[in-house]
Curated annotation (Swiss-Prot):
The keyword Nucleus does not apply. Disulfide bonds: none annotated. It is found in: Golgi apparatus membrane. This is Golgi apparatus membrane protein TVP23.
Length: 266
C-alpha cells in the first residue's frame, strides 16, 4: 500500500511537470505572435517592384461614350463630315463661296481702301454662291431645284424639281445644306444691323444684295421641299388607289394624306 502511494505521487509530479512545460511553451508562442505580426512572417510570392512599370509615365485611360470622341477619331470634326458625305465637292464649294463672301466683306477694309474693288469682289462671290446653291448644291445634295419661268402670256410662275423619293438624300449632305441655307442669312442680317449702328451706309447695299440672294434661295428651296413632299403624298395615295382602294375609300385616303402633309409642311 505504501509503494502504491509512492508511485502515485511520482506520477502526479511527472504530470505536473508536463503541464508546466506545455504552459510555458504556449505563453512563449503567444508572446511571439503579439510581438511579430502574422503578415511579417509570410514572404510574398513575387516582389512588388516586378509588377510596377517604372519605365514610362502612366497614361490616363480614355473612356468612350456616345457623346465623346477622341482627337484621332476619323469620323469626328470637319474631316468626318466630308468622309460621310456622298458629294464632298459640292458640299465644299457650298460653304466656300458663302464663307468667302462674308470674310471678304469683313476683312476688305483691313487690306485695301479701294471701295470699288471690295464691292466687286463681294458681289462676284455672292453671285457665284447664288448660282452654285440653286443649280449645283441644291440638286446634288438634297435633290431639289427651282427656277422662275415666263409663259407665252407673260405670266411668271415658279417651277420646282425634286429627286425620285426612292433615292433619298444623304443625311449628312441634307443636314449641312439646310444649315448653310438658314444660318448665313442670319449672319448677313447681323452684319446689316452692325452697319446701321456704325453708320456705314456705303456698305449697306452690299449687305442688302446678299440678303436678297440668300433669302431667295431660302424661299425657293423651302417651297421646292414642300412641293416634293406633296408629290410624295400624292404618289402614296395613287399607289393605294392602284392596290384596290378606289372609289370613296381612295378619295378619303387621298384627301387625308394631302391634308396631313399640308398641315405639317404648309
Amino acid at each position: 500500500m505504501a509503494e502504491l502511494k509512492k508511485g502515485h505521487r511520482v506520477f502526479s509530479g511527472q504530470l505536473i511537470a508536463v503541464f508546466a512545460v506545455v504552459e510555458s511553451s504556449y505563453t512563449l508562442h503567444t508572446t511571439m505572435s503579439v510581438a511579430q505580426p502574422l503578415l511579417d512572417t509570410i514572404e510574398p510570392d513575387e516582389p512588388l517592384e516586378s509588377s510596377v512599370n517604372t519605365k514610362g509615365p502612366a497614361t490616363a485611360p480614355v473612356v468612350l461614350t456616345p457623346t465623346h470622341a477622341t482627337q484621332n477619331d476619323p469620323e469626328s470634326g470637319i474631316v468626318g463630315i466630308f468622309r460621310q458625305s456622298a458629294h464632298p465637292t459640292a458640299l465644299f464649294f457650298l460653304y466656300l463661296f458663302r464663307i468667302a463672301a462674308i470674310a471678304v466683306y469683313i476683312l476688305c477694309g483691313w487690306f485695301t481702301d479701294n471701295y470699288v474693288l471690295s464691292t466687286v469682289a463681294v458681289v462676284v462671290l455672292l453671285a457665284m454662291d447664288f448660282w452654285n446653291c440653286r443649280n449645283v448644291s441644291g440638286r446634288t445634295l438634297v435633290g431639289l431645284r427651282f427656277w422662275n419661268q415666263v409663259d407665252e402670256d407673260g405670266e411668271s410662275y415658279w417651277v420646282f424639281e425634286s429627286r425620285d423619293p426612292s433615292r433619298p438624300a444623304n443625311p449628312i449632305d441634307s443636314k449641312m445644306f439646310w444649315i448653310a441655307l438658314y444660318v448665313f442669312p442670319l449672319l448677313w442680317s447681323v452684319l446689316l444691323i452692325v452697319s446701321l449702328l456704325k453708320l456705314g451706309f456705303a456698305f449697306i447695299p452690299i449687305v442688302v444684295l446678299a440678303l436678297v440672294f440668300n433669302i431667295t434661295n431660302v424661299i425657293g428651296f423651302t417651297y421646292a421641299d414642300r412641293d416634293a413632299k406633296q408629290k410624295w403624298a400624292t404618289s402614296v395615295a395613287g399607289s393605294a388607289w392602284g392596290m384596290g382602294l378606289g372609289g370613296i375609300g381612295g378619295q378619303i385616303l387621298t384627301g387625308a394624306v394631302k391634308k396631313g402633309v399640308g398641315r405639317v409642311f404648309g
